[in-house]
């Protein structure tokens, strides 16, 4: 009986073999019979541990994929692959690249990422046809001083290494378009970085940079700049020269201001400045006419600039966890705004003009001090309106009411007015010895005063028959919290009691505090 064998075994002229994800432990023997014609060999994602001597007789190879194996050695015979154009040995266990790699003169794309390498061979810069080099996550401590000899290099990835400086010759890579230096230990960026005029993407996130050189403004073709997770205290005014920039990520730094030159970035689409120390945004940000996403989370902003209303393409605005006490009415000018988040601020009102942002679908105002919402919000087609962390549904049922201070029609619901945000345990523990501070932690004077407007005050006047006392005695009943607020208050005081009982050095106050809390929880 005859058995049909695979066509690629019959045909002696095979140019490509794909054996990825085949659980191979050894290189298949049948591959070698095609040594005269094989140009592409893909053995990625197997369990190969070594490359036999016979393997390097495949001298016609132009593309070799060996990534995601367990290869422990790259032999000097790699030099036999003189026609090799693409080599991927990423995510193996190769401790060293042989100097003989320099004989692979045709090599254009190489990926050595994810190996236990600590250095590149000195001969590496002789691979002058190399256009794309990836050496991410290999514990690389330094680059060859003559790396600038790779003058055809267009993409260089050096992410997640141990680099502390960049050799001067790096700036000779005049054709470089992508440079990824993220998650290293670089303290200074050389001024000569401004010579990389063809650079389009520059990643410097996760380093130790305290400043950027003025020369960075020379990168007229730069599209993406990521300098997040550094120690930047300021940005150079020359950043205004990055006229092609579309993405600017400067999150997690120490910035207190943004230069006015930001307004000259007319093509800027994404601006992320979260987790800094900004107290204000420059009015110039309103000149970034192409801005679609603005992230300002976790700063110290008190308000937003009026010019923000000029951002007609802005679709996502996030200013969570700041110190905002008000919003400009010009926010309604953001006619493309779909997501607006101002969670955990100090807002007491939302301007009615926000309803002019007719594309708004998500509004997150949880964790503020809002008394009510403007009636104009009913004109929006909201899909989610968040007022509380404990809100079970994205939309609530609202009632129309009247603001007795202004006479305006307003919206209210069971979650309004908002309670102030709950203090953290670390903030409470040092103060929990004082009973009055405990009360302050679970109530707010502003809430008590303003709640009167929601529920009429009830006064009980003592009978006039008591003529011996001429004083008029009254009992003022404050507004009763909604059921949801009562549960929140009960949970708050119970958590405080547990934290305080566990704290050391507070035994003397324990009975007094527990007694006070028991009275509160019992009434709830």
Curated annotation (Swiss-Prot):
Q: How does it sit in the membrane?
A: Peripheral membrane protein
**Tissue expression remark:** Expressed strongly in testis and placenta, followed by heart, lung, kidney, thyroid, trachea, colon, prostate and pancreas.
Coiled coil segments of this chain? 484-512
Task: Read off the Pfam families from this record.
Answer: LRR_14, LRR_8
Q: Could you tell me which residues the LRR repeats occupy?
A: 11-34, 35-58, 60-81, 83-105, 107-126, 127-149, 150-172, 173-196, 198-218, 219-242, 244-264, 265-288, 290-310, 311-334, 336-356, 357-380, 382-405
Which UniProt keyword terms apply here?
Answer: Coiled coil, Cytoplasm, Leucine-rich repeat, Membrane, Phosphoprotein, Repeat
Q: Which InterPro entries match?
A: Leu-rich_rpt, Leu-rich_rpt_typical-subtyp, LRR_dom_sf, LRR_R13L4/SHOC2-like, Synaptic_Scaffolding_LAP-MAGUK
| UniProt cross-references to PROSITE patterns, sorted A to Z | LRR
In the UniProt record, the gene name given for this protein reads: LRRC1
Broad class of the protein's primary localization: cytoplasm
**Gene Ontology CC entries for this record:** cytoplasm; cytosol; membrane
- The name this protein carries in UniProt is Leucine-rich repeat-containing protein 1
Subcellular location, in the record's words? Cytoplasm; Membrane
Its taxonomic placement starts with: Eukaryota, Metazoa, Chordata, Craniata, Vertebrata
Which organism does this record belong to? Homo sapiens
Show the stretches that span the lipid bilayer. none
Description of how the protein assembles with itself and partners: Interacts with DLG1 and DLG4. May form a complex with DLG1 and ERBIN, where interaction between LRRC1 and ERBIN is indirect.
Residue numbers carrying Phosphothreonine: 480
